[in-house]
Amino acid sequence: MASQESLTEEQIAEFKEAFSLFDKDGDGSITTKELGTVMRSLGQNPTEAELQDMINEVDADGNGNIDFPEFLTMMARKMQDTDTEEEIREAFKVFDKDGNGYISAAELRHVMTSLGEKLTNEEVDEMIREADLDGDGQVNYDEFVKMMIVRN
């Protein structure tokens, strides 16, 4: 669970600014109506139910609105997710030796061997098969992400 403690003062100040953009009437909380207004101004078109779901996800005290501490928790969570995506992208680059956007059986075998994992050709092929959703014999970035998310 991400917490506000993981945020810097600078980030908190930025989020306070963003919060005030949402909090149109300045009462210290964001309603579904205010959330809808901001999202529509950003070109999104959420339904009332979607807006309510978004609020319910972070509405810790159950009052139907998002206050600033709840908003901070939501932003801290989002930032943690982004770190994870970045880590997965970096890991993919390690495997994708030739940088063509795919991990071949040979590349996978090379990395696993260099990590001290002595795998048989069958084991490497099996790993590729499990992750290779479109059946082209190699693993693309999207397939790699799905595999990493399932494992974590």
UniProtKB/Swiss-Prot annotation:
What Gene Ontology biological process does one annotation of this record name? mitotic cytokinesis
Under CDD domains, the record lists: EFh
Where, by residue number, does Ca(2+) 4 bind? D132, D134, D136, Q138, E143
Q: Name one GO molecular function term.
A: enzyme regulator activity
Modification N-acetylalanine occurs at: A2
**Record: residues binding Ca(2+) 1:** D23, D25, D27, S29, E34
Name a single GO cellular component. Answer: nucleus
Residues reported to bind Ca(2+) 3: D96, D98, N100, Y102, E107
Q: What positions does the entry give for Ca(2+) 2 binding?
A: D59, D61, N63, N65, E70
Chief location category: other
Similarity field: Belongs to the calmodulin family.
| Cited function | Calmodulin mediates the control of a large number of enzymes, ion channels and other proteins by Ca(2+). Among the enzymes to be stimulated by the calmodulin-Ca(2+) complex are a number of protein kinases and phosphatases.
Listed under subunit, the entry gives:
Interacts with cmbB, numA/nucleomorphin, pgkA/phosphoglycerate kinase, and thyB/thymidine kinase in the presence of Ca(2+). Interacts with dwwA in the absence of Ca(2+).
Q: State the protein's name.
A: Calmodulin
Q: Which organism is it from?
A: Dictyostelium discoideum (Social amoeba)
Gene of this entry:
calA
